[in-house]
C-alpha cells in the first residue's frame, strides 16, 4: 500500500501516472488531503468513483488516531497522544497565543539522543516519522480545532479520554457518511481565525536525525495547496548534529533553527547530553552562527534551567562568553519527570539568571510555562500510557 499522505505534488503526479491517471489529479488529491483534511478517499467527491476505489485499494491516508487528549484548566493548552497505523504512540501539543494557534509536533517515535532530563528518550528510538505522520499530527489537531470537539474538557477531569473518544467518533462518522470533516473554506473569516499558523518541531525525537523526511515535511507544510504555513512560522529544534545544521544552512530556508544547549561548558553539557560526546559545544554553537550568517535568520538557544546544575552566577557568565553578543536564549524552567531528580529553580531565581545574561549582552527570555497542570513534559503522556 502506498503512503499517499507523504507524497508532495510532484511525487503524486508520478504515482498517479503509474496508475494511468492524468497529472492534474495530483493537485486535486493533494488539496483534499492537506487543505480539506479528508480522512477517506470516498470523501473526494470531484474524483471519479473508479479512481476513488482504485486509490482505496492501492494507497492509504495517514490519520493519527487520538488515544488521549488532555486540556489544561489553567491556559487551555491541549496535549494529544496519537496512535499511528503501526500502533506507535506520539505526542503533540496545541497552544493558544495572542497571534493564534501554535502546534508542537514529534519527529520520531522515541529518541536516541538520551538527554538526562528528558522523558522522550528513556526507551530509545523506535523509528523516524514519515512526512505524512508529521503533517498528520497538525492536520488531526486542525480538524479538532475546526470541529470544536474539545469543549468536553470543561466537564471532565484532565486525564479523561472522553475528548479523544468524541474526536474519534467525529472522524469515524465523517468517513461512514462519505463526507469530509467540517473544514471552513480557505480564506474565509472562520478559517483564518481558527487555522494553525505556527509549528514547532520540538516534541519527541531529534528532527535532524530524520533529516530527509523533515525536508519533505517542510516542503509539504508550506505548499500553498495544503496547510500553507509560512517557513518563517516554523521552528525546528536540534540537539546539535553539526553536519546536518551546516547542510540545512545551505538550503537557505527561512525557518527558525533552535539549538538545545542546556549547559554553558563542554564538561557540563556532556553530562546532560550524550550528543556532546560527538560534537563539542563550541562546534555546535559555531554551526548555529554559520546557519544564521548563511540564511539571515536569527537562531535561538534553548536552555533548561535546572536548580543547582546550570543556574549559578558562574554558569551565566560562562554562557555569555560562549555565545555572541546579541544572541537570543530561551530559558526553560525544567519540567519535572518522575524518573529524574532534576527540579526547576524558583521564578525569582530564573529572573535573576535572565538579568545576569542581559547584563552580559545576551537577549534572554523565560519561556511562558503552559500546560503545567497536565503531562506537560515531552514524552510523559506516552510513557504513562505505555506503563499501563
Where are these regions (language model features)?
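Auxiliary Fe-S-binding modules of radical SAM enzymes
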Residues: 1-90, 96-98, 146-154, 173, ...
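Generic detector of bulky aromatic hydrophobic side chains
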Residues: 53-56, 105, 279
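Conserved Radical SAM active-site core
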Residues: 88-92, 98-106, 113-254, 265-267
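Conserved AdoMet/S-adenosylmethionine-binding subsite of the radical SAM
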Residues: 143-148, 191-360, 364
Amino acid at each position: 500500500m502506498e503512503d499517499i499522505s507523504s507524497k508532495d505534488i510532484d511525487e503524486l503526479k508520478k504515482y498517479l501516472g503509474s496508475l494511468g491517471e492524468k497529472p492534474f489529479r495530483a493537485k486535486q488529491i493533494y488539496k483534499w488531503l492537506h487543505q480539506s483534511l479528508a480522512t477517506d478517499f470516498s470523501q473526494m467527491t470531484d474524483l471519479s468513483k473508479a479512481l476513488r476505489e482504485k486509490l482505496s485499494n492501492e494507497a492509504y491516508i495517514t490519520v493519527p488516531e487520538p488515544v488521549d487528549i488532555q486540556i489544561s484548566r489553567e491556559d487551555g493548552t491541549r496535549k494529544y497522544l496519537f496512535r499511528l497505523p503501526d500502533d506507535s504512540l506520539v505526542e503533540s501539543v496545541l497552544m493558544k497565543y495572542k497571534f493564534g494557534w501554535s502546534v508542537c509536533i514529534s519527529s520520531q517515535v522515541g529518541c536516541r539522543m538520551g538527554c538526562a532530563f528528558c522523558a522522550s528518550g528513556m526507551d530509545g528510538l523506535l523509528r523516524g516519522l514519515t512526512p505524512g505522520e508529521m503533517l498528520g499530527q497538525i492536520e488531526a489537531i486542525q480538524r479538532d480545532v475546526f470541529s470544536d470537539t474539545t469543549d468536553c474538557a470543561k466537564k471532565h477531569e484532565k486525564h479523561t479520554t472522553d475528548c479523544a473518544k468524541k474526536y474519534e467518533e467525529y472522524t469515524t462518522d465523517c468517513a461512514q457518511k462519505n463526507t469530509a470533516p467540517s473544514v471552513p473554506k480557505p480564506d474565509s473569516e472562520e478559517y483564518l481565525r481558527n487555522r494553525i499558523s505556527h509549528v514547532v518541531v520540538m516534541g519527541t525525537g531529534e528532527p535532524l536525525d530524520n533529516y530527509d523526511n523533515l525536508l519533505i515535511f517542510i516542503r509539504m507544510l508550506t505548499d500553498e495547496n495544503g496547510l500553507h504555513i509560512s517557513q518563517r512560522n516554523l521552528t525546528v529544534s536540534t540537539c546539535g548534529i553539526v553536519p546536518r545544521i551546516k547542510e540545512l544552512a545551505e538550503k537557505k530556508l527561512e525557518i527558525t533553527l533552535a539549538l538545545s544547549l542546556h549547559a554553558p561548558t563542554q564538561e557540563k553539557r556532556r553530562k546532560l547530553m550524550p550528543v556532546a560526546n560527538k560534537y563539542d559545544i563550541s562546534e555546535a554553537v559555531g554551526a548555529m552562527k554559520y546557519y544564521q550568517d548563511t540564511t539571515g535568520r536569527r537562531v535561538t538557544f534553548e536552555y533548561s534551567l535546572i536548580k543547582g546544575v546550570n543556574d549559578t552566577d558562574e554558569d551565566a557568565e560562562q554562557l555569555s562568553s560562549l555565545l555572541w553578543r546579541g544572541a537570543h536564549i530561551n530559558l526553560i524552567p525544567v519540567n519535572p519527570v518522575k524518573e529524574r531528580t532534576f527540579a526547576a529553580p524558583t521564578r525569582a531565581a530564573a529572573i535573576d539568571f535572565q538579568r545576569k545574561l542581559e547584563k552580559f549582552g545576551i537577549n534572554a527570555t523565560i519561556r511562558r510555562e503552559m500546560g503545567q497542570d497536565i503531562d506537560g513534559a515531552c514524552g510523559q503522556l506516552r510513557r504513562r500510557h505505555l506503563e499501563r
